[in-house]
Amino acid sequence: MTKHMMRRRTALTTLSLGLLASCSTAKPKIPGAQVPVLPDTGALAVAVDAPAVTLPPAHALASWPQQLANAAHAPGNVAGPTGLAVHWTALVGMGGGFRQPLLASPLLAQDLVFAMDANAAVSAFSVATGHPVWHASTRPKHATEQNIGGGMAYGSGRLYVSTGYGELIAMAAGNGKVLWRQKLDFPPRTAPMIAGSLVALIVQNDLLLTFDAESGTPGWRFTGAVGTPGSTGVAVTGAPAFADGILVAGFASGTLAALNANSGTPIWEQSYASAFGQASSLDFSDIVGAPVIAKGVVYAISLGATVMAVDLHSGAKVWTHTATGTQALCLAGDFAFVLDHNQMLFAVHADDGLVSWALQMPQFHNMKKKTGPLQWAGPVMVNGQLVLTSSRGEIAFVDALQGRIKSTTKLVAPADLPPIAAGGLLLQLTRNGTLTAYS
């Protein structure tokens, strides 16, 4: 890896982790001119003729087997507990920090909750009691590198784990036994995505890799890199999405690509790249949040100041806005809910892009002095409310119809992931490695 790649990866990793190392201790000012790395796009304008937000009824999920619940990344309005009574807590292992973030979403399947710690050690817990069922280290015997990136996905009794040690591992979900493992070209940027017999992920050099779920045999591959070969981006990003035989992936280059899931043949590409005009080492265009597919349309947001809806089959733009963000959009019924990098939350009509409401989430620990910037993760929708978590260690519930914060509750620690909702529980992993089940 070149020095340029390492510098850019370090900068982008810092960006994607949402200032994990920030603290209240005063630091001396660094001399020199400050150069913004993200464009200040301003807020999306609420349209006077935008329709009022409507929502579909909440539906219960028995499982949450992969990132954002399913291969399309569109769980919708999920039914969950109406309160936050702690049902159980468990320690998953090593907590996250600036150098080793804890960004793998927990999963629920086969009456087990799966979690991965900052060292990529995987644990399974009873969904009923939180008692540990099995624990497995994925660290190779002679590994010297730190784990950054990766995640998990479940399918047909198997748990698929991508690790920052540059491996994809298939385990028996019931006991953690390794069934097969594949060495990757580079460490992964994403968790695996499973669609039938296909396992797909993206590695750090912007290469999309596929594997046979049963045997681990490598399949087709596709490069999303543009320009300098091997250039890299944000270290931890969202998994590819799948629907109607089409796999959609976002890359560090700002390219959103749709591919035939069977052959890897490109169907279309759209650019979410920045026109910010910085040097290539600073001009960030990464599509960090996972793309979402709903009703034949793909939704994604990039660091290149683009949020766009694209027809899944043709690649035609449905609508586009100028906004920068790292969180996957939340789709529910006829509306998309968008969180931008200024911690503004928007309700956008999915058909035409009209903005129905905008809400400024708290931006700072100290709002008066505007110190201690906050980062919010999410949203996901539970019982018709948008749920977000913060780097201050709070969980917020937002009225999705009106765009107002209904309540906030303190978590046991800061959170860099939104919760998952399945099996009658709300499950939250916090930065200190604590997994909490609410009922």
Regions found by a protein language model. Give the residues of each.
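Blade/loop signatures of beta-propeller domains
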Residues: 34-44, 53-87
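Blade-level signature of beta-propeller repeat domains, shared across WD40, Kelch, NHL, RCC1
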Residues: 417-439
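Extracytoplasmic beta-rich repeat domains
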Residues: 88-107, 135-153, 179-196, 218-243, ...
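Bacterial signal peptide processing site
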Residues: 24-26
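Short loop/turn segments that connect beta-strands within beta-propeller blades
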Residues: 127-129, 172-175, 213-215, 261-263, ...
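N-terminal secretory signal peptides and thylakoid transit peptides that target proteins
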Residues: 2-18
